[in-house]
């Protein structure tokens, strides 16, 4: 059953290739304009509108102007595809469009109906050819050619939650005897405390060392976000007294001694240290004299300071992740190396070991604020495609499907003796133990993107599109609504609280009122809306009406070492975001308000998260997503994705004008207001922070990578300490802010094609 679930989720994208039925080619009416369909609101497409204004003001008089048509304001490419298929089935000659942004499988639907537009008349020489080759693998296309342009692309990255991973590894790691003085004082005071010595080790290679350094830095950064309420947790008498009753498991995990592992471990440590710094600063004003003397003693040594900072972070993470357990098949005796993150097989094995070592991961009943797993995958289908393609040696003949004679051929998948099927079985067997341990989550089966859970330390690491990376970090004192097993982050710009009304202003139908951020308010009514009222919504669902009339007492809390719970006077939240899935129990979809979908949320617990309980950008360690299934696979596979610009046949005149516009879009050198000359395609990609796979962009990225490598070598030669210099010159997780504007295309730090704003 789990195999079917895994495959069913992963094959959703493939299945869409096969569902369209042809109705035959037809001509649209010639209305003298080119319509470009998008799945965003007009306001969100402001950069695109600026681009079109530039074209319309400078085009030849005989060429048709281009205008934007909004199909869906929520960014749903699925809804955009359904709209296109609906118009194809109806042979809509009057209200169709000429261009649209969507995924290439939409070309299959167009081709089945003979409505694909061959773009061979467009000069595509600026593109790196390999990024156009996907056109050869679109099913249903009869004549080879260019039908979709990869104008808006993103990649995938692996994001490590530095503070969480530091707590996991530090708990399991075999100690080397260099305990901090504070820790020593704690152990002396807690004389009855039982210990179990650990056996996990860190590899000593350079890659692992750098990674561990980054993880340590993330823990430091996390500790820096502590508040005064955490002052007593490290050295106060009450804390020590509490610890007398607990057993401390000291792990046996080994950190690899290779350079890569050393560097990674340093990054992880730094993340934990940063997480603990502010907490320790705040301690000085509130701790007892005895505790203060311990801190003063410890401050004589900088390295001991850093140890305390990571301990502060670890103590906070421990509250949600629980005690480390030294168990067989877990991290007991395990050697941690940085290359564990380079292949799916080794990454899954590591995640299983973590899940077995922390019992909270495998708990049956979880709320939206509990630990959700170890490993999150934003797109299961992308993980399956990448792992399968790598396992097949990067050969389409060994892939899940191939395109033969314009059709998707799945014969390899159904042949149990094929390399494809054997590889797929190995891939599933790699994921199955993690599924069994409840250590894997994905966007497909949860109502919350995986990066949102990592944002609140509920995951250790995750793979996600770079498109979501800018939304992976929490703001100060962020609020969340916990609704059963679900959690929703409160966006103050689109979610507004409704408080219980003391009176109904003489109207018995008034259920509540919400104030928006633009000095307007919206009133909720049952039965009917009074005449003349425009800023109002009619509530029809009787369950919601009952919840608003008789609200349950909701709670408001702040998660910290001294959590407080108070009664919350908010009885409902209105969310102007249709991506929140309704359940007609606690979350209800209302009528549209203007052009916006509105969702009502009741029966929630409101939580305020302080910084030490959230992931900040400096605390993330960013790596390429796994590019192999097994370490021995001959080729590395990096997935790039995103909607393409697709042409749709209309009529001879409009088709001709469409080709002219696309040639301008890809090749014209335009002077923009920022004073830089670039093509419209480059302008839009930069404004929207997408990867544009132009040759010159990729070449510039390669040069930046070479320059960065030389820079790092020089720094190591000058100082003799790559870990220290990493934070100054070559460490994307810690620095790079001054270089932000220099890089486009591939990230100089993680070597992946990504959003420009992701390069820090």
UniProtKB/Swiss-Prot annotation:
Stretches of the chain forming a coiled coil according to its record: none
Q: According to its record, what are the GO cellular component terms?
A: plasma membrane
Where is this chain's protein located in or outside the cell? Cell membrane
In residue numbers, the region (Disordered) covers 221-243, 272-315, 705-741
Tell me the membrane topology, using the record's own terms. Answer: Lipid-anchor
* Compositionally biased region (Basic and acidic residues): 272-284, 705-721
Q: What UniProt keywords apply to this chain's record, in alphabetical order?
A: Cell membrane, Lipoprotein, Membrane, Palmitate, Signal
Where composition is biased (Polar residues), the residues are: 300-312
Q: Where is the signal peptide?
A: 1-20
Residues lipid-modified (S-diacylglycerol cysteine): 21
Spell out where lipidation (N-palmitoyl cysteine) occurs.
21
* Major site of localization recorded for this protein: membrane
Q: What family does the Swiss-Prot or TrEMBL record give for this protein?
A: Belongs to the MG185/MG260 family.
Name of this chain's protein = Uncharacterized lipoprotein MPN_199
